[in-house]
Amino acid sequence: MFSRDKIAYILLILTTLFWSGNFIVGKAASLFEIPPFTLNFYRWVFAWLILAPFTLPEIIRKKNYILENIKLITILGITSITIFNSIVYYSLYYTQVISGVLMISTIPVWIIFISSLLNIERTNIFQIFGVILSLIGVVFIISKADIDLLKNLEFNKGDLTMIVAMFSWAIYSALLKKKKYEISQITLLQIVIICGLIFLIPIYFIEMSMGHVIKLGKPFYLTLTYVVIFPGLASFFFWIKGIALIGANRAGIFLHLMPIFGAIMAMIIFDEKFMFYHFLGAIFIIAGITLSNTVSYTHLR
């Protein structure tokens, strides 16, 4: 029989593995020319349909409370469902999976930065240094450690848009901590999905009007199945259960497995190379995350 800790470790490892796989599938979708906003639209439409029977009773029962908080929930939907997931898939059309997962791995540090800006949490000097170190790491990645690219501002489009995704999720996570909601997490997710889809629908139609139409077939069906079930629903429930078993602080450490899983899968599946600038960027990112989290953990203890 597994202990609580072992069960949590298994669930959290699977969570980060599935989230890393989302980058692999997103890259594969670009190779099969599956439109990024269309993929994200169908991902959340099917997730919404699956969750609907389980959440509708509470939505009806708590409709007044939901309406009272609809502005904040709408922002959560826009930053997570509409922007983050769409931009990740879009970015992978232009950048490497390794670059993407390394940049996304800095999100815990940017959550600290955004939380400080929005006066949600206080920031200490060590966390500020952590943000600076992580930023240096991101600069190494987007510039490929080439001073000429920095001077001429010649960056990969996918790296720049991945920064947008990175900050969008950081804003979402910071705002999520701002308030304790009086509805279940699964119902909150469903309302966030609905709000995000409302703003994603026009973008989906714009993408189609530009000639970016999905080609129905095995690649699309397999891609959609994965993104709905694994990084979408399964990871969400595993993450919640893992936090319940060992706490948010210990669970958060497992997010640092994403660049490891992502890089290994990218090198095996797409034959991507782990370049020297990836190494430099990773060193600064790891240092920034470690500095921020170690100090935060010490204070929380």
Question: Can you describe what each PLM-predicted range is?
Answer:
Residues F46-I50, M103-L117, I132, C195-F199, ...:
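Alpha-helical transmembrane segments of compact multi-pass small-molecule transporters, enriched
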Residues L51, I111-F113, L117, L149-M208, ...:
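Transmembrane alpha-helical segments that form core, pore/gating elements
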Residues Y42, I81, N85, S99-T106, ...:
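Helix-helix packing/entry segments at the starts of transmembrane helices
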Residues T298-R301:
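Conserved small/polar residues in nucleotide/adenosyl-binding loops
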Residues M1-Y42, K151-K178:
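Glycine-/small-residue-enriched transmembrane alpha-helix faces in small-molecule transporters
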Residues F18, N22-F23, A52-S99, M103-I104, ...:
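Specific transmembrane alpha-helical segments of multi-pass solute transporters/efflux pumps
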Residues N64-E68, V101-I104, I120-F140, F155-D159, ...:
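Loop-to-transmembrane alpha-helix entry segments
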Residues K27, A47-I66, I136-N152, C195-P219, ...:
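Membrane-interface helix-cap regions at the ends of transmembrane helices
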